[in-house]
């Protein structure tokens, strides 16, 4: 009964509210920022490698890796597989649409996070939707509601789902026992996650900045190899992606399973553009201008969906193994790669899932640390944080043995609540970000390295960093 209720809420949110909100906001921001996805792509690449003035500060690259660690997760494999198996080839197109227009939303929200970030008692930068909701809208209760919804989404919903997706990958191996193996794998993952979490935020940044680039490069390399092997199928694959994306039945028929709805659901789950998660990481970066980190987070959306999600889609669709609802998730991906690469294929996917899930768990918990700092108006006690991290690790263990459809629906609903709070807020505050963008481009045009001062855009709010 509970599962039916949650599924109904999820279907309503993604068939009506979030379709209008996500696509509408993305188009609005794309127009107002004059197509930054193309116009400022070069600037985004340059901003990634910029060094912070303080040697001990978090660089743009490190902030990108933390946000990408959360974005690049099991959704890039299992989420894409599920979307295609349920919604068909056209789901891929709608994932691309959400990524391209959603990246403009990512630019706005991360710029706002930089402008309104605060300096903690420990000297670190803290920011995100909660901070700009309180500072600009003077509504701390709404900010706390957002924090609670995000903690529920990431520490519980997403982390349980990542744990389940990881253990399900092993179901293709002969040693897998449906009664015991999920709990054994969940226990091992929980122990490793707990060890890393108890090392604090600095260890999270260090681990993710090492794992994410290697993981992404290896995954794309394998995808390219598979596409070369199956190159004869690619024209047909692209043709079906486009034709099914605009098929009336695929868009409107049985909407819960339509290409559009599945593309939006899994695209949002994968790249997180506009839901308010990445700003918590982007605020920690030390940059000379807020727009630089906004551009970096725009690039992170491209990395996630246009590279990694597309890699999964092309690997599977070009294999000749037809997608089917009973194969959704790991089984279809493993079958597709086995067809192209033999026994190496399922083994590679298993390794990729382990790395993707692990970096997802760490990135998610980094966000929760930031949120707890906000709720407590400073660093919570060591005892509280230790207890929270132990509970977070236990959640990872529990998720491994839960029922998958319930986990997907819970995650979708919780993520939708975040979007329903954050997107209207960034629409209201977008003029501040747009003024910052104009200031950035004016300084670039004059030939200098853009340096932001709040008073230059008429911002009366007394910031901690941009006086």
Features from the language model and the residues they span:
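N-terminal alpha-helical transmembrane segments of multi-pass membrane transport
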Residues: 1-74, 84-91, 102, 427-467
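Transmembrane helix-loop junctions in multi-pass membrane proteins
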Residues: 2, 18, 33-37, 75-80, ...
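Membrane-interface loop-to-helix entry segments
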Residues: 21-28, 32-45, 165-170, 181-229, ...
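Helix-loop-helix module between adjacent transmembrane segments
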Residues: 25-30, 98-123, 129-130, 134-164, ...
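Extracellular/periplasmic helix-exit of transmembrane alpha-helices
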Residues: 30, 108-117, 224-240, 254, ...
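Flexible loop linkers connecting adjacent transmembrane helices
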Residues: 35-60, 82, 88-91, 104-137, ...
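Alpha-helical membrane segments and immediately flanking helix-loop junctions
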Residues: 54-86, 112-130, 134, 151, ...
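Selective recognition of specific alpha-helical transmembrane segments in multi-pass small-molecule
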Residues: 101-109, 187-201, 212-232, 265-266, ...
